Each structure stands twice: as C-alpha cells, then as structure tokens.
From Swiss-Prot:
InterPro entries: Aldolase_TIM, TAL/FSA, Transaldolase_1, Transaldolase_AS
Catalytic activity from the UniProt record: D-sedoheptulose 7-phosphate + D-glyceraldehyde 3-phosphate = D-erythrose 4-phosphate + beta-D-fructose 6-phosphate
PROSITE patterns named among the record's database cross-references: TRANSALDOLASE_1, TRANSALDOLASE_2
Protein name: Transaldolase
Record keyword ATP-binding present: no
Cellular compartments per GO CC: cytoplasm
Subunit composition and interactions: Monomer.
Superkingdom of this protein's organism: Eukaryota
Amino acid sequence: MSSSLEQLKATGTTVVSDSGDFASIGKYKPQDATTNPSLILAASKKAEYAKLIDVAIDYAKQKGGPIDQQVDDALDRLLVEFGKEILKIIPGKVSTEVDARYSFDTEASVNKALHLIELYGEQGISKDRILIKIAATWEGIKAAEILQRDHGINTNLTLMFSLVQAIGAAEAGAYLISPFVGRILDWFKASTKKEYSKEEDPGVQSVKTIFNYYKKYGYNTIVMGASFRNTGEITELAGCDYLTISPNLLEELLNSNEPVPKKLDASQASSLDIEKKSYINDEALFRFDFNEDQMAVEKLREGISKFAADAVTLKSILKEKLA
C-alpha cells in the first residue's frame, strides 16, 4: 500500500513544501516550495542557517548607505539566499514574499518584486523558477497584473480568503493563488464555538468553490490550497491543482496508509451552476463585495499584520548584526 502522500500525488495534486527550513523538506520530494516572512524568521533562528544571514549581512555592508537601507538590503538578500538553497533541493519553483508593508501600494510591490528578481538573477537563477508572493489586496492584485503582463514575472497571490479575491486574481492573470484553509476554520470555530468535520470545514469549502469557479470558466491560474490545520483538510482537497503543506503534516501523510481518493475534479465543474462575476476593472465593486465577507476582511487584516510584524522582527535581528 502506498503512503497517503503518494496517493495524494496520484490524484493529480502537485505537492509543495511550506517551509523555510529547507534541510527538512527533501525527503518528501515536493515539486515546489513556499516561504513567507514568518517561516523565514523561524528558520533563521536555527544555528544551521546562520551562514545565510552572514551572507546577507556582508552583502548589505558592502552596499553601504544609511542603516535602514542596509537592513532592507540584508532582508531582500536573505530571502533570496533561502530561495537559492531551496531551489537546490526542489525541481520546480520557490515562492518569495514581498514585504507585507507594501500590501496597499501597487507601485512599491512591483518595484520590490523587480528587485528580488534582479537579486535572483545575480545568483544565476532565472525568473521562471520564482513566484513573487503578494497579498491579495486590490493593490496586490493590480501589482500582479502588471508583473505578469509587462514583465513576465509569475506571481502567487496569497492571504486569500474569498471568491472575490480569487476572481480578481484570475482576471489579473496571476500564475497561482494561495487560498487559505486553516485560518478560515480558525475564524469559524472562534465565531460559532462549533467543531467542524473535514467535510464541513469552511476552509475546505472555500477552496472547492474557488477551484470549481476557475475550472468552469477556464482560468489557467493554479489553485494552491494553503494553511492546513490537519491532514483531513488536505485529503478533502485531493485533486486540487497544488497543495502547500508544512513538513509536520507531510510527515504524517508519509507515515499514513489511509486511502486518499480524488475529491476535486475539474471535469465536473462545467456542469455546476456558478454565477460569473468581474472585478478587475471595478475597484469599488471589488471593495464592496469583499467587505461583505466579515471573515475574509478580518483574516486578511490579521495576515498582513502578522507577516509585517515578523518582517519587522527579522529586520531587527539583521539590524543588530549590522551595527
């Protein structure tokens, strides 16, 4: 009997590793990997990654300039160093996140993305192996549209909690989206004081809805479920384009022989009754419809704030080392 992880891959789902701790991901044979400021912060506290920080610090010192500029340079280089090491282990792409403080600034997001791609290029890594991760705000969706259309840079729109965000992302031509599962479940459990089975899980339902909408209307944007609390959420999404999974849950799947039947099927979406909507040229409608979803609004706010705070913590570590 093959492992649940192998069975998941056999449903057509591409398995992605959600970790900055690249020393731990090779054995799961993921295609791609995702990182974010929180994951990089966690990994950077481990002794085995100190040499990456040293490279980033040396780079920033050589560039010089005011201390805040050096800190920014060190952070960008650190993200790229992690990405570079991860790409030695995986055959596919790595997602590198734009600082969450630019989540409401299209131009700054585009400029930061171009800079990160330039830094990767200096390391001999072509842009086709990188996904630039941007929060799926209105401004982030517009940044993705510019990066995809004008620069041929592939984007991963993250912190996605609603179909409204997903529709905007697809219309923008984003390469991939990361609809969150576990954080949606967290909100509903806190809000309703109820427990949910894996079948009822509102995070799972959200990804299914987005997947079916994309397949019904022929969008090529990849749906990559993210933020899982347990393996049940993962196996309920078997057949989703991609799933990005933390090493501890990858380990559980590797050690399990529970059957994993396909649950999401693109060929069945065409018969579903789903209304088509458009947001890409209507910011007011996007904002209104998104605002109607209390969970999505609260979770997007929280997610941006948390990623931004972890980037600040990471910068303070770098600032100490630059002093």
